[in-house]
Amino acid sequence: KNYSKKVLSACKNKPVSLEVFADRNDEMIEQGLKINSWGKNIYVKIPVINSKGKFTGQLIKKLNKKKIKLNITAVYTVAQVKKINSCLDNKTKSIISIFSGRMGDVGKDPVPIIKKAIQITKSKNKVEILWASTREPYNYTQAKQLGCQIITMPPNIISKVSNFGKSLNQLTKDTVRTFLVDSKKSRYKI
């Protein structure tokens, strides 16, 4: 709670997602209400299912009816997006966080799922799709091209986005220079 309030004091005018720690719906509702009371810029982060695999739709509906902004997280499938979307009204802002990077980690292409999610939620202008667990800078380009409203990126990925626009010829030169520096550091001889 103290750490969350510290974050909120630093981010007064930015949306902040804070996740519940519970696994049971009644406890998640209690925690969600408490978290929501900490500020107007909060999105209460709720998993799409609990640890037993049960869809949290009733929880989503209850909190949404109370006008609590939600960030439904750990989403991977179009079916999950459809179920979530059916639980949300068009009065309260919500985010659906699709874990694109983790999909890629297991050899699945997240692009068709994000694309379909954007289409599914298009009729509800209060619902935004978030590209989560970004693994590489190009994910930023993919998300932007698809019309994904939000992308989360760790600092090491954000710093690489500044390289966008570099020519491939310059990239070749930079790569060869790196090879030369690495070979000198190795002190190997042929």
Locate predicted features.
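Sequence-level detector for tyrosine residue identity
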Residues: 3, 43, 76, 138-140, ...
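Catalytic alpha/beta core domains of metabolic enzymes, predominantly
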Residues: 68-159, 165-180
